[in-house]
Amino acid sequence: MDVSNSTPVNSPATIARVWYSDKMDIPIINDSHILSFILVDHETVVQHVADDHDDIEVVSALAVAATNFSKMNDGLDTAIVHRKHSMLYYITTLALAFRLDTSIFDVIHTTVTIGDLVPTVERVPTADAVPAVYPAMAPVSPESNRDTMVQSVAVTTKEHIRRPRNQFIIYRQWMSARLHEDNPGLTAGAISSIVAKAWKGETPQVKAHFKALAVEEDRKHKLAYPGYRYQARRTRNERRKLFSTIKAVSQYPVPVTNPVLQYPVQATSSLTTADLNDPVMNLGSLNN
């Protein structure tokens, strides 16, 4: 998708949606269950059959489920997605949600915050490149200068490359989906405890199966990201500090020191969509 002329507006979800979509679909589970679980590209997706098309009601109804889903996935940001012209809604990781086909799905809710977004700004290098509507000696009011500073921290998403999962993480996501389906009332803590005990008691053959999946995922990851180095995500406090800084800039005018530099700031992004094309998990032999 060509995003060179895209102008991100509205919410952070809208921004990420423009850059990440690569026309993925989610299989439909045709049954009467309110909640069903689907494996999509090695990730668990929760399907919900709603009573009506009220997105606000659906988000409210799925709030607890979305929170537990995030805990099951190491605290990753999540999204609630609506399949257009249907009563089907999905809880997915944020990364997967923004890879879905925008002609089929709408992202109606995310847990992403402005603190997860990184400002990247490109300024025009010389006065000759300044647009004519901003002549060199044009007066600039403190109010308009403040708006320019707010634009200078215009949010653009930074692609987050996930680490390849180890054998236990793959097992945990698979087993958690089965437990949720059979016991929808279980808490995330109870599920984590059950999964840990189950993994400890699994046979070497079962563990070898998931080890093979992890090795294959690691191989695909190295091919897709040859220069990848793991970097810890921002802590909650770091995100809160960044948000406070952006909020402070938006509230106070900045003195004008060089009118030549007062011009619209354009955000740029080097984001590319990466698809590992992971093989579908062959778990048929484990379905007892």
UniProtKB/Swiss-Prot annotation:
Pfam family of the protein (one): HMG_box
Species, as recorded: Podospora anserina (Pleurage anserina)
Protein name: Sporulation minus regulator 2
Lineage: Eukaryota, Fungi, Dikarya, Ascomycota, Pezizomycotina
UniProt xrefs under SMART domains: HMG
Location in the cell: Nucleus
Gene3D superfamilies listed in its UniProt record: High mobility group box domain
GO molecular function, one term: RNA polymerase II cis-regulatory region sequence-specific DNA binding
Record-level GO BP terms: cell differentiation; negative regulation of transcription by RNA polymerase II; single fertilization
Disulphide bridges, residue numbers: none
Keyword Transcription: yes
Broad class of the protein's primary localization: nucleus
Function: Transcription factor that is required for post-fertilization events. It is required for the developmental events that occur in the female organ after fertilization.
DNA-binding region (UniProt annotation): 161-229
InterPro entries, A to Z: HMG_box_dom, HMG_box_dom_sf, SRY-related_HMG-box_TF-like
SUPFAM superfamilies, sorted: HMG-box
GO cellular component labels: nucleus
Keywords assigned: DNA-binding, Fertilization, Nucleus, Transcription
